[in-house]
Amino acid sequence: MRGRDGVPRLCRVLGNPLAFTVVQILAENGDIRPSQIAQAVGRSVARVSNVLAALRLAEVVRYETEGRTVRYRLKHPRETRKLLAALDSFIESASAVRR
């Protein structure tokens, strides 16, 4: 995912509330198993795995296997944390304007 074509794709995948929550969890916890994410969000492992696959295609996450254990992490952790912080700041500013 490079250049301007990647931006709409990234926005589309992060527009899914579950995917956005998964990214937040990964930003807070580093590498983590899909079952741990599923438990944290109260969804099935299958549903979380589908979301992780979409995030992988959008080049947001990557995974590593160790035996039968799969762990996911952010592909670009520093940049992703900056993006999450910028989105939080935008929401705060927009909320202040509405008051």
Could you tell me what each predicted segment is?
Residues 1-7, 28, 75-99:
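Amphipathic alpha-helical dimerization/coiled-coil segments
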Residues 5-44, 66-79:
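N-terminal helix-turn-helix DNA-binding core of bacterial DNA-binding proteins
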Residues 62-63:
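Short beta-strand "wing" residues that participate in macromolecule-binding interfaces
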